[in-house]
């Protein structure tokens, strides 16, 4: 009678009375399975912990009752506790009581839990029963992509986007497809998918970063910079940090040093490198404890002075070397070798410079000092050995 009265209260949308009646039913019959499940239904959204507590009481009484696991899985899934949801689904999802929707949610919970192999296994099980099912094909594409099985991911994507029944595409679908195509070096196709994703959800401005990355990888720096500007402009001022500005500098540097001379004029190359220099200058001032601003400033100036006739990069490499030497950390050895290589070469050229004849001895000593510093870090460094042999 109490369960019946509880059911009437549910129809009347009186949750308080309904839960009271189900509690009564359990009190008079602790094995009244229906009352536990109905009670959990009332609280699954409003108070999940109460619902879970009641279901666990039933689980203790009936450990093999898959209806309990099913309800627990549903509640954990609703509250985004995918770890617990996976545990609950595992108890029944491969058995006869599982519906297609249960399998979808199990596969998705596994995916969100980063168990891509198991998620793929469950999705493929679903596809054996229904090869054109949108959610299973979606998860196959996602999982194959995350597992870096790109050829299989591409096949799944083809089915998902061209053959599925009732497919309701989201920005995430286009984003994943973009990641997949970018991984396969299909950069133009990747951009098309990223653009579809951001059009579908304009708040996902991170996608402009993906668009920029795709263009950068095909050496289309103008478009890469343009897309990155859109991403950067979408951020609040406090989020426009030096590490994000750093990518601007890298893109300008890439544009100025790209090998394809047809894609960029000499003047455009120079302008790009000057933009890189000013960007890295701003970073050096904003983060004085980091060597990266001046290190990349040195690289930009070295590219502006490819013959090292003006020594444009010299003050920056000197500053970086002094900072990194003070840290005394082998982690910075490769950066120090780059600094010493430039400075060693700069002084090597200065030895032969007629205008600096009076300083030839001092320049020779300086060059020897820097090449020797390289050998102290890397005794097998062939460039340093050759340079020292040439000087001596």
Question: What is each stretch, according to the model?
Answer:
Residues 1-359, 366, 386-392:
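Alpha-solenoid helical repeat scaffolds
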Residues 369, 374-390:
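Alpha-helical oligomerization segments
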């Amino acid at each position: 009678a109490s369960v019946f009265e509880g059911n009437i209260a549910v129809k009347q949308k009186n949750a308080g009375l309904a839960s009271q009646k189900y509690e009564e039913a359990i009190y008079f019959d602790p094995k009244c399975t229906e009352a536990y499940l109905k009670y959990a239904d009332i609280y699954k959204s409003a108070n999940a912990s109460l619902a879970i507590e009641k279901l666990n009481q039933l689980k203790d009484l009936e450990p093999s009752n898959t209806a309990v696991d099913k309800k627990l899985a549903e509640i954990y899934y609703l509250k985004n506790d995918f770890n617990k949801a996976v545990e609950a689904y595992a108890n029944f999802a491969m058995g006869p009581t599982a519906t297609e929707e249960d399998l979808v949610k199990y596969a998705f919970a596994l995916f969100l839990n980063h168990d891509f192999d198991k998620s793929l296994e469950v999705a493929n099980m679903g596809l054996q029963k229904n090869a054109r099912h949108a959610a299973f094909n979606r998860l196959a594409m996602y999982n194959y992509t995350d597992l870096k099985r790109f050829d299989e991911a591409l096949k799944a994507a083809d089915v998902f986007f061209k053959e599925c029944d009732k497919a309701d595409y989201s920005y995430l679908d286009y984003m994943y497809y973009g990641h997949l195509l970018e991984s396969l070096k299909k950069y133009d196709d990747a951009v098309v998918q990223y653009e579809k994703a951001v059009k579908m959800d304009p708040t996902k401005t991170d996608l402009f970063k993906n668009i920029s990355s795709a263009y950068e990888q095909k050496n289309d720096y103008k478009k890469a910079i343009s897309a990155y500007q859109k991403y950067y402009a979408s951020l609040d001022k406090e989020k426009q940090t030096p590490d994000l500005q750093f990518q601007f500098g890298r893109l300008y540097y890439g544009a100025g040093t790209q090998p394809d001379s047809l894609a960029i004029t000499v003047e455009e190359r120079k302008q790009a490198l000057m933009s890189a220099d000013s960007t890295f200058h701003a970073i050096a001032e904003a983060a004085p404890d980091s060597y990266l601003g001046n290190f990349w400033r040195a690289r930009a100036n070295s590219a502006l002075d490819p013959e090292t006739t003006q020594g444009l990069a010299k003050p920056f490499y000197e500053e970086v070397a002094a900072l990194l030497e003070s840290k005394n950390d082998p982690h910075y050895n490769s950066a120090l070798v780059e600094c010493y290589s430039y400075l060693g070469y700069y002084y090597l050229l200065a030895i032969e410079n007629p205008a600096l004849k009076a300083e030839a001895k001092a320049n020779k000593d300086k060059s020897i000092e820097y090449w020797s510093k390289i050998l102290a870090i890397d005794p097998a460094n062939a460039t340093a050995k050759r340079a020292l042999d040439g000087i001596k």
